[in-house]
Amino acid sequence: MTFAELGMAFWHDLAAPVIAGILASMIVNWLNKRK
């Protein structure tokens, strides 16, 4: 495994939960505003 592949794997492991958390918070805010 090269350094670039290691970096990509690390980025995906780090980015996936961050993006999921941002999407979840946006959905929660949207649902709260709709009430």
Swiss-Prot record:
Give the UniProt subcellular location, in the record's own words: Cell inner membrane
**Residue spans crossing the bilayer:** 10-32
Major localization listed first in the record, in broad terms: membrane
Membrane topology designation: Single-pass membrane protein
Recorded hits in Pfam families, A to Z, give: Ldr_toxin
Q: Which UniProt keywords apply?
A: Cell inner membrane, Cell membrane, Membrane, Toxin-antitoxin system, Transmembrane, Transmembrane helix
Induction profile: Expression of the proteinaceous toxin is controlled by an antisense sRNA, in this case RdlD. Only a few of these TA systems have been mechanistically characterized; the mechanisms used to control expression of the toxin gene are not necessarily the same.
Gene Ontology cellular component terms for the protein in this record: plasma membrane
The entry's family comment says: Belongs to the Ldr toxic peptide family.
Q: Function, please? A: Toxic component of a type I toxin-antitoxin (TA) system. Overexpression causes rapid cell killing and nucleoid condensation of the host cell. Overexpression induces stress-response and a number of membrane protein genes. May inhibit ATP synthesis due to its insertion in the cell inner membrane.
User: What is the designated name of this protein?
Assistant: Small toxic polypeptide LdrD
The encoding gene: ldrD
